Amino acid sequence: MDVFRRLIPYLAYLFSSFLKLTTRVKIVRGEIRDRLRAADQRFIYALWHQRQVFFTVSHRGDNVTVLVSRSADGEMMAEVIRLCCGVVSVRGSSSRGASGAVLSLMKALKSGVDLGITPDGPKGPRCEVKEGVMYLAQRLGVPILPVTNAQSNRIVLARSWDQFHLPMPFGRAAVVYGEPIEVGPGDDLNLKAAELKRALAAITSEAEALVA
């Protein structure tokens, strides 16, 4: 089993490469991301945990690092992200008091990479924004960029807590961006979390409609 777990990241890389080659992708409002980059503005991608596979596919080669948990599954995901995106993940928590992770993320931003976080991860509740991502954006002084994806050909793991989406080859996909969300020093994090949840719900519905 240990040998198989070590092989999983490499199998995932091969699968994601094949998926990228065989999927027709429509990008919606990609100019929002381009505008931030043109201004040399670092930011945090926020996406639902269930849709992280195609995020690594559609953002391969981007300067992005992802916050992953310190669990065994997190270790495996970190290796998948290293292979697929070419960056080292930050291990830890986005919660208040997780100073080590915050410092590592600050260093990553200063080195010129953007961040990727699943605000409902690592264990849910599904599609509920936790305060941690808002705290990070406030602490790091960077905007949150909502992003989502949907595929016409996929398997949904209905028994997983997040109803995990496993995209399959030879389909259509949509990658949709929302408007950046700023979190100022005096902002109410709960209100900002609700704003992000609404934004992700709206763009996810849009992405699903595009591949229906």
Residue positions per predicted region:
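Non-catalytic C-terminal accessory region of glycerolipid acyltransferases
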Residues: 1-21, 34-37, 60, 83, ...
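Short hydrophobic/aromatic-rich motifs at helix boundaries and adjacent loops
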Residues: 2-6, 24-26, 48-51, 76-78, ...
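A short, well-structured juxtamembrane/interface segment
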Residues: 17-42, 48-54
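A conditional alpha-helix N-cap/helix-loop micro-motif detector
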Residues: 26, 95-99, 126
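General small-molecule cofactor/ligand-binding pocket signal
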Residues: 26-28, 90, 176
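Pocket-edge structural micro-motifs
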Residues: 27-29, 47, 68, 179, ...
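Proline- and acidic/polar-enriched loop/turn elements at helix boundaries
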Residues: 30, 93-94, 149
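Catalytic core of membrane glycerolipid acyltransferases/transacylases, capturing the structured
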Residues: 42-96, 157
